[in-house]
Amino acid sequence: MSAPIVIVGAGLAGLRTAEELRRAGYEGGVLLLGDETRPPYDRPPLSKQFVRGETDDTTLRPPEFFADKNIELRLGTAVTGVDTAARTVALADGSTIAYDQLIIATGLRPRRLPGLPQVAGVHVLRAHEDAETLRAELDGATRALIIGAGFIGCELAASFRAAGVEVTLVEPQPTPLASILGEQIGGLVARMHLDEGVDLRCGTGVDTLRADDAGRVSGAVCTDGTEIDADLVVVGVGSVPVTDWLADSGIELADRSAGGGVLADEVGRTSADAVWAVGDVAAWQHDTGVRKRVEHWTSAGEQAKLLVTALLGGAPPTMSRVPYFWSDQYDVKIQALGTPSPDDDLTIVSDDGRKFLAYYSRDGILTAVLGAGLTGQVMKLRAKLATPTPVADLLAAAG
């Protein structure tokens, strides 16, 4: 009996890849390994509907799906290493599994802040278990401190305010999302949070945490010397690729300073024979010649299609590869098409408080569109990013 295709990581990218294998007609064994005990689930609702108690169901596929598709799903199974010469992966229980092809889809883990004391009431948010714990503690919280005003931090701030909890949001950058969207857009996001009563403190970080006599967090001391009272703390300072299990594999990894991850070509093929990478952990080759990770929900499905087609020897499918991501904060959906960069030129097309539209450009050519509260208007511009489009033409057409 031949070895199966083994997918390490039962998140969205791993699931989409398993689905694509069956959709493409692959009839061999498919083994999906996940280190969590929960079947594949949707992460975006964790910081929003789930933590607010509005939904309990984040499952991506019903239990019978895997049996129907003849996909073997093994949960609670941690992979600790890979031998690319022998084509085997090692498990935490000491056993090994042979593979015909290996697909790495291990995703990310939350970045920790070094030096913070280990006290009760301090959380990160990545896994379902994190969200469950956070939701349980939110019920009795009165004042929350969120460290980091990236997407997770901003979404949690909105969810906590909706739950009636006072929120202090601390961010070392000049504005929320500055390193992702730039300071000008970050200022518009900051305005929204300030309007909702968030105590937003930018340009400072957290130096240490305070704890009460019972060992539970009671507040923080910032790097500027100010103090914050809090009975709930969330650290949201980004994530790092889960690649430690590949340390001795010989598979080429991106440098940590460049974002880390598994280096791969434009279809997910890594430096090792019969080894592929997909999803948040994968630094794919892009049209610009740069290899980088794209941490977007829609990218997981797009990459899975390209990878599976290449793995099975087919021609690359014709498909739009315009990146898309979104973030729900309060009653506003923030959407981005393309790749926004703080280094690009920015044109604010419209700004009506909770609704705004902006174009990013480089050398006059559109590189990204970002909008808040303008869902239809943003999505209509997707085609403009598929081919070089001068921003001046868009502005002229809009009158």
Tell where the protein language model's regions lie, with residue ranges.
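FAD-binding core/adjacent interface of flavoenzyme oxidoreductases
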Residues: 1-6, 61-145, 221-223, 232-236, ...
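Mid-to-C-terminal Rossmann-like scaffold of FAD/NAD(P)H-dependent oxidoreductases
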Residues: 2-4, 281-375
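A Rossmann-like FAD-binding core segment of flavoenzymes
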Residues: 27, 73-90, 97, 163-264
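Rossmann-like NAD(P)H-binding beta-loop-alpha module
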Residues: 133-181, 185
